[in-house]
């Protein structure tokens, strides 16, 4: 039997001695060495192999490995031992040859062994990879289409096509079939093509509506557990959800319509949004061109959509790696799921799913990995997103807003000392504008100075001039010990232990009078104006202000819980660079429920006016306090 070295087909001597279950000529089973860098093609391929074995017999042997697998020297040696004796090698490379560090070595050994090789990007034809491939151009194009279109049927026809091309069999082979690249998916209804049809099946008037989008590859591979988890949690919270799969870029050759079309056809109707917020699990930027960073659109579609977009992170760490990591996310996660989406103005949130190896496939030897939901983080992002969404359903008159001055060090002469910003005047301007927009203010102070004087006349973070009794009398509120104890017991056990070790049993001693925690600040109708609580002791603030280890005092936690649960703020504003919230102990990025910024801000929508000339620390605020940055000039 001959083997093609440059085209993928040659003359064969056909024997009638070896036929499959349907009588088709089958000289031998095809051996394919397959490298996948995404894993999304693995599950459809395995299903196709199982069906093919049932229908045709043992006609294909595929050994499949990921780039992570091949980083292990023994795995690499075993794979190449099979590959150099195979009938075809398929290198499916998301991101080009650079994504596979061992590409040159693998390609060289395949050429030396005279093995036909297909190498290509998963989503677009790469001229360099096409020139490196040793199968013919027509064969290369056909394999690319089968792989790019994806799914079980295309995978099965790919195997049959390769049998015909490389072993001279004569199976009936279907042409590559374009899948639905865009559509609505729901675990109770499957695939739904149009928004109107989905609304007839699953929409309740008067509820907040959350959009959710994810890659079509997850839908084709049935890698949907994290999607199902988000859908179920949104609906459990009495909200509508519109879950949409898509191929994010418009590609005429592939037939994909892209993110802008999806927004116009699934998240908008008659030019108006039908969602109140969008959870995005997509990676990279959707509005910037690669490399030159020029905008793809005159008016970005997110601006037309006009709702908050909350970035849900899919980490390529395992959940165990993520939980144990002080950094939180690996550099690839940060680049793809945080830094680039920030160009689109997304609000960075938390990891909702982590990579997990579920089993090793017996047919291909592939380690099967899926994105498994991180249940508590799913609840977190849904709660945060719903709170953003509800702002569209609450009248301005009813909205409750907490405005927080920074106060470092915690003295009265240091209230509102944001860098490059006249904080008192700025808050006065905010109050004036809120009143003009119909927010529920009782009265507008005469000036920023008058505002600060009114705060100083009550209780502040400066404990030098007042006894605990006086502070308690002038406090806007007191948190009883039993109430704080309930809040405290909601924290993870390890966090409770750390806080007790540093600050004593709750409620501690800082800002406490007769067992009650003192809440500084003033109220003005539905507006609360407060001071960010101190990180620690007044006597030594600088030693702990940027401490990576010292847990927050009981008073710090109680203050933010009071804002959320007693004052019942719909949103909070932190005024200017910078406070302590985003510098609290915890992971660098991709926070867990045991990270103190996450504990403090909870699920409150956070708006943060921030000076434009300090993107580094502004980035810290975005990524660790889930805030919407509003830049101001110097």
Predicted regions and their residues:
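An N-terminal assembly and electron-transfer interface module characteristic of large anaerobic redox
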Residues: 5, 9-634
């Amino acid at each position: 039997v001959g083997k093609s070295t440059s085209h993928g087909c040659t003359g064969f001597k056909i024997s009638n001695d070896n036929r499959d279950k349907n009588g088709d000529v089958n000289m031998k089973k095809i051996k394919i060495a397959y490298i996948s860098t995404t894993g999304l093609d693995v599950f459809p391929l395995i299903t196709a192999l199982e069906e093919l074995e049932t229908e045709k017999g043992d006609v294909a042997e595929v050994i499949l490995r990921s780039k992570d697998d091949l980083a292990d020297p023994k795995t690499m040696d075993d794979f190449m031992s099979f590959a150099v004796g195979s009938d075809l090698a398929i290198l499916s490379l998301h991101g080009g040859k650079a994504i596979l560090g061992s590409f040159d070595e693998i390609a060289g050994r395949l050429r030396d062994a005279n093995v036909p090789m297909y190498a290509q990007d998963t989503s677009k034809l790469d001229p360099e990879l096409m020139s490196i491939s040793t199968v013919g151009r027509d064969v290369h194009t056909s394999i690319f289409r089968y792989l790019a279109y994806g799914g079980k049927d295309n995978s099965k026809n790919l195997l049959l096509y390769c049998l015909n091309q490389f072993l001279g069999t004569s199976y009936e082979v279907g042409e590559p079939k374009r899948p639905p690249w865009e559509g609505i998916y729901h675990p109770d209804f499957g695939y739904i093509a149009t928004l109107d049809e989905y609304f007839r099946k699953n929409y309740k008037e008067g509820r907040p509506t959350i959009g959710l989008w994810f890659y079509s590859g997850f839908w084709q591979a049935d890698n949907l557990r994290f999607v199902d988890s988000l859908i179920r949690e949104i609906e459990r919270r009495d909200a509508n959800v519109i879950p949409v799969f898509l191929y994010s870029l418009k590609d005429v050759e592939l037939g994909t319509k892209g993110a802008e079309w999806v927004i116009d056809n699934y998240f908008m109707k008659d030019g108006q949004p039908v969602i109140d917020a969008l959870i995005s699990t997509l990676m990279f930027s959707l509005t910037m061109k690669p490399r030159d960073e020029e905008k793809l659109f005159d008016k970005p579609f997110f601006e037309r959509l006009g709702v908050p977009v909350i970035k849900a992170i899919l980490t390529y760490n395992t959940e165990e790696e993520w939980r144990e990591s002080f950094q939180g996310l690996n550099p690839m996660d940060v680049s793809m799921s945080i830094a680039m989406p920030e160009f689109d103005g997304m609000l960075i949130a938390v990891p909702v799913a982590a990579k997990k190896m579920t089993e090793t496939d017996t047919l291909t030897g592939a380690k099967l990995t899926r994105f498994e939901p991180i249940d508590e983080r799913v609840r977190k992002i849904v709660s945060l997103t719903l709170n953003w969404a509800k702002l569209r359903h609450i009248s301005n008159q009813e909205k409750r807003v907490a405005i927080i001055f920074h106060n470092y060090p915690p003295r009265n002469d240091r209230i509102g000392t944001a860098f490059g910003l006249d904080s008192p005047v700025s808050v006065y301007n905010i109050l004036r504008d809120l009143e003009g927009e119909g927010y529920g203010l009782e009265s507008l102070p005469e000036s920023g100075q008058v505002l600060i004087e009114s705060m100083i006349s009550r209780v502040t973070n400066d404990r030098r001039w007042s006894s605990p009794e006086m502070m308690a009398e002038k406090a806007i509120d007191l948190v009883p010990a039993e109430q704080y104890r309930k809040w405290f017991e909601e924290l993870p056990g390890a966090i409770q232990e750390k806080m007790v070790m540093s600050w004593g049993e709750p409620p501690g001693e800082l800002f406490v009078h007769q067992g009650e925690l003192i809440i500084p600040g003033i109220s003005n109708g539905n507006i609360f104006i407060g001071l960010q609580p101190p990180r620690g002791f007044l006597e030594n603030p600088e030693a702990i202000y940027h401490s990576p280890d010292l847990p927050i005092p009981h008073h710090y936690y109680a203050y933010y819980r009071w804002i959320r649960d007693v004052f019942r703020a719909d949103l909070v504003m932190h005024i200017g660079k910078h406070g302590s919230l985003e510098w609290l102990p915890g992971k660098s990025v991709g926070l867990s429920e045991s990270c103190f910024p996450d504990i403090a801000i909870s699920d409150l929508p956070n708006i943060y006016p921030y000076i434009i000339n300090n993107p580094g620390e502004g980035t810290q605020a975005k990524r660790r306090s889930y805030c919407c940055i509003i830049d101001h000039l110097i």
